[in-house]
């Protein structure tokens, strides 16, 4: 059976964004332990404005020309991710994962775990041992959690 009545409110756009961000999704699943509530596909830099209000994310910036990758985290994506960022000035694609509210306090730890995981597989600016399975280089500078 389809919808037979639809009421428009001034809050339609707000609720649409909340649903798209899966803000309420975790409420409907009892004992949900999922750390990430949403992953995006790779997005072109020209569309950054559409995503700048995303909260509690681990993000990935890719520079396809120079074959570089940068990983970071942000409580607000727009406050951290901007064109021309010094660590990876020519990035042209990005993606991000939204962290479940239950894990917001662990955002930095999740970021560092992600950096260390990528560093183990690809060349990196920290000169950490890796398998070299990509022609991209991880350009993060902070590898304090890396254990040789």
Model-derived features with residue positions:
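Boundary/linker segments flanking structured domains
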Residues: 1-64, 68-69, 73-148
């Amino acid at each position: 059976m389809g919808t037979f009545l639809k009421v428009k409110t001034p809050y339609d756009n707000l609720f649409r964004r909340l649903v798209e961000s899966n803000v309420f999704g975790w409420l409907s699943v009892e004992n949900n332990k999922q750390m990430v509530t949403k992953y995006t596909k790779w997005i072109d830099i020209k569309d950054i404005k559409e995503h700048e209000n995303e909260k509690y994310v681990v993000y990935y910036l890719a520079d396809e020309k120079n074959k570089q990758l940068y990983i970071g985290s942000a409580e607000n994506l727009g406050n951290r991710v901007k064109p021309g960022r010094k660590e990876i000035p020519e990035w042209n694609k990005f993606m991000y994962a939204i962290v479940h509210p239950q894990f917001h306090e662990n955002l930095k730890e999740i970021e560092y775990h992600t950096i260390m995981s990528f560093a183990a597989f690809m060349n990196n600016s920290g000169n950490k041992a890796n398998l070299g399975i990509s022609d991209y280089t991880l350009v993060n500078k902070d590898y304090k959690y890396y254990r040789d």
